[in-house]
A protein has these predicted regions:
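Acidic, mature catalytic/reactive cores of soluble proteins
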Residues: 2-487
Length: 487
């Protein structure tokens, strides 16, 4: 707390609820810190250090500020004594770290501030071991009063791969290097298989538990910890991961040992994709009902095989390349035959329905279909007509396990903006982009969802999906601006 002048009064509200308030919180005030733990789990402890009287903090006393003071909240007891001078040094060290990090980021003539803010957000959602969280919160509702409340504090292959690829393209290769090591570390035994998601330390078991004693945000129950989606088959996940691995292989091959380790991982992923792409799955939206043959899942399986074949060619593994190219061709033929629906003049969400889905917009950026293909043009226009509402996009607007979605899914609006841009509707794309930027909070942060009417941010916050898509879309316009300036 930086004191400027006068004698201002402050009161500290310190109410930690360890172990999700499943037990009573106990406070142990020592001469150095306030130690907090729960009656339901006394192994996990929190330590609050401060230059203010510690007992006064616990008693909610009012303090008169006459000089700089500090608070330090830690999950570990500090070995070295903590004082105001040390904390000022730690603050300066932190400031220098983030200044250096942003200095390594590409700069742009327009939208640079929002690009930088989003990249910082993605970085802060990264763990030191390379894992990247989908969000930092659990159970903030997609719509107030409904039950679409999920725990996003995990590392999905899909979300993390997209986040890391965004950081990689903007100049942060170290993030990609660490993530690759994290993925490799999840195989602790030869018989291990890939999951779609992991805990931040590589945990495989992510059992979902409902905390009935908590009322939730604005009384939106249930509050969940854990996520049972880790059991699901989501065939699209490997496409995002393989796209990242290909970019990494192409630009940062590494040592011979690293190349060989990566090649073993690629072969394992290819084997899984070949075995699974014909099977129904839960898709990018993690449907909790019966699996379907989602078009976006088939497309991303094609991406996985296509990128695997490219890597094989780089390594002169032509037999592998040939096999995977043939399998990729089979997927493309299958999608063109079963995914395109003449009745709606568009690709559909799944082989067995005529529904539209925002994930269909990803067919072009991942190279499955050309931007000038008439089928993609028609799909973009059909998706826009069906799912764009008041400047924002539904991911889909048909019934699922919980009814019809009632809020906008932020990343989908960015997908539409890119799709409109590449099919030539650049002015409309720019207008939509400038409009959605107005719906961030005062720090430029986005959650998962936005209310169509009030523009209130909903869902878990901040959301990696939203920020990686914002960066990619902003870069699209910034690169065009650069071309116009230096033409």
């Amino acid at each position: 707390i930086h004191w400027i002048k006068g004698r201002p009064r402050i009161k500290v509200n310190y109410h930690p609820a360890p172990d999700y308030a499943r037990g009573k919180a106990f406070f142990n005030v020592t001469s150095r810190y306030i130690e907090t733990y729960s009656s339901s789990n006394n192994k996990d402890r929190q330590y609050l250090y401060s230059s203010l009287p510690l007992q006064g903090i616990v008693n909610h006393q009012e303090f008169i500020l006459e000089k700089d003071e500090f608070f330090l909240l830690s999950y570990n007891e500090k070995v070295i004594p903590v004082d105001i001078e040390r904390e000022k040094l730690e603050y300066c060290r932190t400031l220098v770290y983030w200044l250096n990090w942003t200095d390594r980021t590409r700069k742009f003539t327009i939208y640079n501030d929002i690009i930088e803010r989003s990249l910082l957000t993605l970085k802060m959602m990264s763990f030191y071991n390379g894992a990247v969280l989908a969000s930092l919160t659990t159970s903030l509702p997609e719509a107030v009063g409904e039950v679409r409340n999920w725990d996003y504090r995990f590392c999905w292959l899909r979300d993390a791969s997209m986040s890391i690829e965004t950081l990689f393209k903007i100049g942060h290769a170290d993030a990609a290097r660490k993530f690759m090591k994290f993925i490799q570390s999840t195989f602790v035994a030869e018989h291990d298989t890939y999951q779609i998601m992991y805990g931040i330390r590589g945990e495989r078991k992510l059992t979902e538990v409902i905390l009935d004693h908590l009322s939730g945000y604005k009384n939106s129950k249930p509050v969940r910890i854990g996520n049972d989606a880790y059991h699901q088959r989501q065939n699209d996940s490997f496409g995002y991961l393989m796209d990242l691995i290909y970019q990494y292989y192409r630009l940062m091959p590494g040592t011979l040992d690293e190349i060989e380790d990566m090649w073993e991982m690629v072969k394992s992923i290819m084997m899984t994709v070949v075995e699974d792409w014909r099977k129904p799955d839960k898709g990018i939206w993690e449907i909790r009902g019966e699996g379907q043959h989602f078009v976006s899942s088939k497309v991303m399986c094609w991406v996985a095989l296509d990128r695997g074949a490219r890597i094989a060619r780089i390594l002169n593994k032509y037999e592998n390349s040939r096999r995977w190219e043939e399998e990729a061709d089979a997927i493309k033929a299958d999608v063109m035959r079963n995914g395109w629906k003449e009745e709606i003049q568009s690709f559909s969400q799944a082989y067995g329905n005529l529904d539209l889905d925002s994930s269909l917009l990803l067919m072009e950026p991942y190279g499955f279909i050309d931007a000038d293909d008439i089928r993609y043009h028609k799909t973009v226009k059909a998706v826009k007509k069906s799912l764009l509402h008041k400047g924002l996009m539904y991911r889909y607007n048909t019934h699922d396990d919980f009814g019809c979605p009632s809020s906008a899914f932020t990343i989908c609006t960015f997908w539409l903006i890119r799709a409109l841009y590449v099919i030539g509707e650049k002015n409309e794309a720019r207008c939509l982009f400038d409009e959605i930027l107005q719906y961030s909070n005062h720090l430029g942060l986005f959650s998962e969802d936005i209310d169509f009417e009030t523009k209130e941010q909903l869902g878990n916050f901040p959301q990696a999906y939203s920020h990686l898509a914002l960066v990619n879309t902003a870069v699209l316009f910034a690169e065009e601006d650069k071309r116009l300036i230096f033409k």
